Protein backbone atom coordinates (compact mmCIF):
# COMPACT_ATOMS: atom_id res chain seq x y z
CA UNK A 1 0.00 0.00 0.00
CA UNK A 2 1.32 3.42 -0.88
CA UNK A 3 1.01 6.13 1.72
CA UNK A 4 1.93 9.77 1.30
CA UNK A 5 1.86 10.48 5.03
CA UNK A 6 -0.61 13.37 4.70
CA UNK A 7 -3.32 14.06 7.25
CA UNK A 8 -6.89 13.86 5.84
CA UNK A 9 -7.44 17.63 6.04
CA UNK A 10 -4.21 18.30 4.14
CA UNK A 11 -5.06 15.64 1.55
CA UNK A 12 -8.48 17.19 0.92
CA UNK A 13 -6.90 20.64 0.55
CA UNK A 14 -4.43 19.33 -2.02
CA UNK A 15 -7.20 17.45 -3.83
CA UNK A 16 -9.33 20.62 -3.86
CA UNK A 17 -6.50 22.50 -5.59
CA UNK A 18 -6.07 19.69 -8.15
CA UNK A 19 -9.83 19.77 -8.77
CA UNK A 20 -9.84 23.55 -9.20
CA UNK A 21 -6.98 23.23 -11.70
CA UNK A 22 -9.12 20.76 -13.66
CA UNK A 23 -6.69 17.90 -13.07
CA UNK A 24 -8.96 15.49 -11.16
CA UNK A 25 -12.66 14.75 -10.90
CA UNK A 26 -14.76 15.72 -7.88
CA UNK A 27 -12.97 14.44 -4.79
CA UNK A 28 -15.72 14.28 -2.18
CA UNK A 29 -16.79 10.77 -3.10
CA UNK A 30 -16.11 7.23 -2.00
CA UNK A 31 -17.26 5.69 -5.28
CA UNK A 32 -15.01 3.18 -7.03
CA UNK A 33 -16.92 3.33 -10.33
CA UNK A 34 -15.13 4.69 -13.41
CA UNK A 35 -16.88 6.19 -16.43
CA UNK A 36 -16.50 4.56 -19.83
CA UNK A 37 -14.25 7.48 -20.86
CA UNK A 38 -11.97 6.93 -17.86
CA UNK A 39 -11.75 3.22 -18.59
CA UNK A 40 -10.86 3.97 -22.22
CA UNK A 41 -8.23 6.56 -21.22
CA UNK A 42 -6.69 4.08 -18.77
CA UNK A 43 -6.65 1.25 -21.28
CA UNK A 44 -5.19 3.54 -23.98
CA UNK A 45 -2.37 4.52 -21.62
CA UNK A 46 -1.67 0.87 -20.77
CA UNK A 47 -1.59 -0.19 -24.44
CA UNK A 48 0.78 2.68 -25.28
CA UNK A 49 3.16 2.19 -22.33
CA UNK A 50 3.12 -1.50 -21.35
CA UNK A 51 3.17 -4.91 -22.99
CA UNK A 52 -0.03 -6.45 -24.29
CA UNK A 53 0.05 -8.85 -21.31
CA UNK A 54 -0.65 -5.88 -19.02
CA UNK A 55 -4.01 -5.15 -20.69
CA UNK A 56 -6.83 -7.59 -19.92
CA UNK A 57 -9.09 -8.52 -22.86
CA UNK A 58 -12.07 -6.86 -21.18
CA UNK A 59 -12.15 -3.82 -18.88
CA UNK A 60 -12.02 -4.45 -15.15
CA UNK A 61 -15.35 -3.31 -13.74
CA UNK A 62 -15.88 -2.54 -10.07
CA UNK A 63 -19.23 -1.95 -8.43
CA UNK A 64 -19.83 0.55 -5.68
CA UNK A 65 -20.45 -0.63 -2.15
CA UNK A 66 -23.95 -0.37 -0.74
CA UNK A 67 -23.26 2.89 1.11
CA UNK A 68 -21.10 4.57 -1.55
CA UNK A 69 -21.94 8.07 -2.77
CA UNK A 70 -22.80 6.88 -6.26
CA UNK A 71 -23.73 10.32 -7.61
CA UNK A 72 -20.07 10.82 -8.58
CA UNK A 73 -17.56 8.45 -10.09
CA UNK A 74 -14.27 7.56 -8.43
CA UNK A 75 -11.58 10.18 -7.91
CA UNK A 76 -9.48 10.04 -11.07
CA UNK A 77 -7.60 12.24 -13.51
CA UNK A 78 -10.07 14.38 -15.43
CA UNK A 79 -10.69 14.34 -19.15
CA UNK A 80 -10.89 11.77 -21.90
CA UNK A 81 -7.09 11.59 -22.19
CA UNK A 82 -5.27 11.77 -18.89
CA UNK A 83 -2.40 14.15 -18.24
CA UNK A 84 0.47 11.89 -17.23
CA UNK A 85 2.54 12.60 -14.12
CA UNK A 86 5.47 13.32 -16.44
CA UNK A 87 3.43 15.95 -18.30
CA UNK A 88 2.37 17.50 -14.99
CA UNK A 89 6.04 18.24 -14.25
CA UNK A 90 5.81 21.16 -16.67
CA UNK A 91 3.66 23.01 -14.11
CA UNK A 92 4.35 21.27 -10.78
CA UNK A 93 7.61 20.34 -9.07
CA UNK A 94 8.24 16.64 -8.50
CA UNK A 95 8.51 17.14 -4.74
CA UNK A 96 5.28 19.18 -4.53
CA UNK A 97 2.35 17.73 -2.63
CA UNK A 98 0.11 18.30 -5.65
CA UNK A 99 2.38 16.26 -7.89
CA UNK A 100 2.63 13.42 -5.35
CA UNK A 101 -1.14 13.17 -4.89
CA UNK A 102 -1.86 13.47 -8.61
CA UNK A 103 0.65 10.71 -9.38
CA UNK A 104 -1.00 8.46 -6.79
CA UNK A 105 -4.47 9.13 -8.26
CA UNK A 106 -3.21 8.61 -11.82
CA UNK A 107 -1.34 5.39 -11.02
CA UNK A 108 -4.20 3.93 -8.99
CA UNK A 109 -6.73 4.73 -11.72
CA UNK A 110 -4.64 3.23 -14.52
CA UNK A 111 -3.60 0.22 -12.41
CA UNK A 112 -7.27 -0.60 -11.84
CA UNK A 113 -7.47 -1.49 -15.54
CA UNK A 114 -4.30 -3.62 -15.67
CA UNK A 115 -3.96 -7.37 -15.33
CA UNK A 116 -3.28 -8.92 -11.96
CA UNK A 117 0.23 -9.64 -10.82
CA UNK A 118 1.20 -13.31 -10.80
CA UNK A 119 3.54 -14.97 -8.40
CA UNK A 120 4.51 -18.07 -6.51
CA UNK A 121 3.80 -17.95 -2.81
CA UNK A 122 5.84 -20.04 -0.42
CA UNK A 123 4.80 -20.64 3.18
CA UNK A 124 7.07 -21.99 5.88
CA UNK A 125 5.56 -23.33 9.08
CA UNK A 126 7.65 -24.17 12.09
CA UNK A 127 6.04 -26.17 14.85
CA UNK A 128 7.56 -25.77 18.28
CA UNK A 129 6.59 -28.39 20.83
CA UNK A 130 7.69 -28.74 24.40
CA UNK A 131 6.15 -31.27 26.80
CA UNK A 132 5.87 -28.62 29.52
CA UNK A 133 4.06 -26.15 27.28
CA UNK A 134 1.45 -26.24 24.58
CA UNK A 135 2.62 -26.41 20.99
CA UNK A 136 3.16 -23.30 18.93
CA UNK A 137 3.17 -22.96 15.15
CA UNK A 138 5.05 -20.07 13.55
CA UNK A 139 4.27 -19.23 9.95
CA UNK A 140 5.78 -16.93 7.34
CA UNK A 141 4.84 -16.49 3.69
CA UNK A 142 6.63 -14.81 0.83
CA UNK A 143 5.77 -14.30 -2.83
CA UNK A 144 8.14 -14.29 -5.77
CA UNK A 145 6.51 -12.29 -8.55
CA UNK A 146 6.67 -13.97 -11.95
CA UNK A 147 4.67 -11.24 -13.74
CA UNK A 148 4.27 -7.74 -12.36
CA UNK A 149 0.88 -6.83 -13.86
CA UNK A 150 -0.46 -3.69 -12.15
CA UNK A 151 2.54 -3.81 -9.77
CA UNK A 152 4.72 -2.68 -12.68
CA UNK A 153 2.98 0.70 -12.42
CA UNK A 154 2.43 0.93 -8.68
CA UNK A 155 5.63 0.31 -6.83
CA UNK A 156 5.80 0.88 -3.10
CA UNK A 157 9.31 1.98 -2.19
CA UNK A 158 8.79 0.77 1.38
CA UNK A 159 7.96 -2.77 0.30
CA UNK A 160 10.90 -5.04 0.99
CA UNK A 161 11.56 -8.09 -1.14
CA UNK A 162 12.92 -11.04 0.77
CA UNK A 163 13.07 -14.55 -0.62
CA UNK A 164 12.32 -17.41 1.73
CA UNK A 165 14.91 -20.18 1.88
CA UNK A 166 14.22 -23.61 0.44
CA UNK A 167 13.59 -25.88 3.41
CA UNK A 168 12.64 -29.51 3.59
CA UNK A 169 10.38 -31.02 6.21
CA UNK A 170 12.21 -31.61 9.50
CA UNK A 171 15.08 -29.23 8.60
CA UNK A 172 16.47 -27.53 11.65
What are these regions (language model features)?
Residues 1-172:
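Core catalytic DNA strand-manipulation module of type IA topoisomerases
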